[in-house]
Amino acid sequence: MTQEKKAEDLERGTDATSAVPRLWSTHCDGEVLLRLSKHGPGHETPMTIPELFQESAERFSAYPALASKNGKKWDTLTFSQYYEMCRKAAKSLIKLGLQRFQCVGILGFNSVEWVVTALGTILAGGLCVGIYATNSAEACQYVIQQANVSILIVENDQQLQKILLIPPDKMETVKAIVQYKLPLMESMANLYSWNDFMELGNDIPNIQLDRVILSQKANQCAVILYTSGTTGTPKGVLLSHDNITWTAGAMSQEMEINRVSGKQNTIVSYLPLSHIAAQLTDIWIPIKIGALTFFAQPDALRGTLVYTLQEVKPTLFMGVPRIWEKMQDTIKENVARSSRLRKKAFAWAKMLGLKVNTKRMLGKRDIPMNYRMAKALVFAKVRTSLGLDNCHAFFSSASPLSQDVSEFFLSLDIPIGEIYGMSECSGPHTVSNKSVYRVLSCGKVLSGCKNMLYNQNKEGVGEVCMWGRHVFMGYLNKEEATLEALDENGWLHSGDIGRLDSHDFLYITGRIKEILITAGGENVSPIPIETLVKEKIPIISHAMLVGDKAKFLCMLLTLKCETDRKSGEPLNKLSVEAKSFCQMLGSQATTVSDILKSRDQVVYTAIQYGIDIVNQQAMSDSHRIRKWIILEKDFSIQGGELGPTSKLKRSVITQKYKAQIDSMYLS
């Protein structure tokens, strides 16, 4: 019986042979049935990661693969050097006692060492486990224990000290720790510097490593990704070799970026590699297409990203909504400081850009003559200021992009393609690109995959369910959770609510776990309301709706502020855009405290006016915001309110600001 027939039988809910591997497994050493299509997309020959890596190392051998900043210059590794360095790391891991299917934890910011460890681990037959650099010691302990981490790779002394806070009896599986950035401040048994670690395996023969590589199968686990825990305890998502290699190939096709032809594609790595979106775009797709990955500075998200972009000028750029929002703020601030003539030119070009690109979106290609002028006078300069002048593909993932941000960049000739998915589907499920694009849509289903809307209502809105070679193996050691995510026919239930239009574009309208159910039994999806509030009130940074089991809805608001460049913490000082908003109203406020202490009348009135506009668009009275409160500090990753990709951690926020929430319902 062929793999295609077995997968087809299981999709129908039947199993023709009892000995067939299941579509799921919760064990590190488990094997699953691959979801091969009968023909076309999804029918490609399965490959292991080592097979893909070796093929690319041979094909792109002399091309630069990785680049990291060393003072004022960039040090690069070719694909050939990259592959050999990963083999060297693999031998050292074997020397340290790494066995098949044992886990190697990586704790630190994106770097050559991070990626080499990940690939070295997989070549050595182990499983790569990324740990978010922002994790607390307790969160690190959870991952180490749950995955039985065998070897731990940490970035620097700061991360090492975090690990040393974990009680030794909770680290019994850890055989060794490697620190990949100097200086090495501690001296202890089984602690190695990166250079010493890389020399450990010199006496391991090539044939020993090759045997391990040849023993690997495409339907076995290669990577474990931990969910960010925005809706509960993090779970270890098991991804197979085929999940990774097939999805990287499918995405390079959908993103319209192929193997090297003429100019090499370049990417800037700055989003945490522990997240599937970054791992796919910064490691796996570049290996597939022969792209060059530049590593940004560790403080990229605290303001230095734009300098790296201006220097590197990537051809592909992936952002999360918060990054695009900050870029929008920067552009607006620059325009606000410009002359009256430049402001007029900017407004004219934006209006023309939105008109032309909206037509393009619908398949119309007629471009007016003055569009070239707008491109030269405005669009090209905006791209250059962002470091995106060589960029031909722009993407956003991790959470929905607002209509305001999407149309703002579309009007500047920067169409941002949304990618929708989750860790459990190896990253993407639907993709938008410049050829397949609609504002507010996250595109069409990845070729070779299937989509189902489960339990649809009369408007055609239902839970998004997925089938394809991108669907994960299961959750590590969590059978019950795995069987909640995968139904009896193998469909992955996303927990997201969406609808399809007549052209098969997917629109996500909410998330089941985030829906608020009022005391009157009304279901309210918070994201559309929160997004509208941020669009209507320019001073608002974050908005979070509350009111589960309550008589009415309330909202927590934070204001746009400056950020501490070193710590990433939001400051009390208002951002340039926020100050401009206040000045336009006649307020002299320059800090959040100024607004809160005096309960600045004009600012509060303006916010209420924006809330009133949002309420006018409410579906019913139960969807209206009755009360709101401004918090003293903006949300941040460091403060615990945001996840690694800047998603709201609703349960954390609800608990942290319980007193403020209670005050709205008691007053």
UniProtKB/Swiss-Prot annotation:
GO terms for cellular component: cytoplasm; cytosol; membrane; mitochondrion. ATP binds at residues 227-235, 418-423, 496, 511, 624. It is found in: Cytoplasm; Membrane. Keywords: ATP-binding, Cytoplasm, Developmental protein, Differentiation, Fatty acid metabolism, Ligase, Lipid metabolism, Membrane, Nucleotide-binding, Spermatogenesis. One of its GO terms (biological process) is fatty acid metabolic process. Gene3D superfamilies: N-terminal domain of ligase-like (3.40.50.12780). One of its GO terms (molecular function) is ATP binding. InterPro entries: AMP-binding_CS, AMP-dep_synth/lig_dom, ANL_N_sf. Its EC number is 6.2.1.3, 6.2.1.15. It comes from the Eukaryota. It is a peripheral membrane protein. It catalyses: a long-chain fatty acid + ATP + CoA = a long-chain fatty acyl-CoA + AMP + diphosphate; (5Z,8Z,11Z,14Z)-eicosatetraenoate + ATP + CoA = (5Z,8Z,11Z,14Z)-eicosatetraenoyl-CoA + AMP + diphosphate; hexadecanoate + ATP + CoA = hexadecanoyl-CoA + AMP + diphosphate; (9Z)-octadecenoate + ATP + CoA = (9Z)-octadecenoyl-CoA + AMP + diphosphate. Testis- and brainstem-specific. Expressed in pubertal and adult testis. Enriched in germ cells and Sertoli cells while present at a lower level in Leydig cells. Present in testicular Sertoli cells and large motoneurons in the medulla oblongata and cervical spinal cord (at protein level). It is an enzyme of class 6 (ligase). PANTHER family: ACYL-COA SYNTHETASE BUBBLEGUM FAMILY MEMBER 2-RELATED, LONG-CHAIN-FATTY-ACID--COA LIGASE. Catalyzes the conversion of fatty acids such as long chain and very long-chain fatty acids to their active form acyl-CoAs for both synthesis of cellular lipids, and degradation via beta-oxidation. Can activate diverse saturated, monosaturated and polyunsaturated fatty acids. Has increased ability to activate oleic and linoleic acid. May play a role in spermatogenesis. Belongs to the ATP-dependent AMP-binding enzyme family. Bubblegum subfamily. This is Long-chain-fatty-acid--CoA ligase ACSBG2. The gene is Acsbg2.
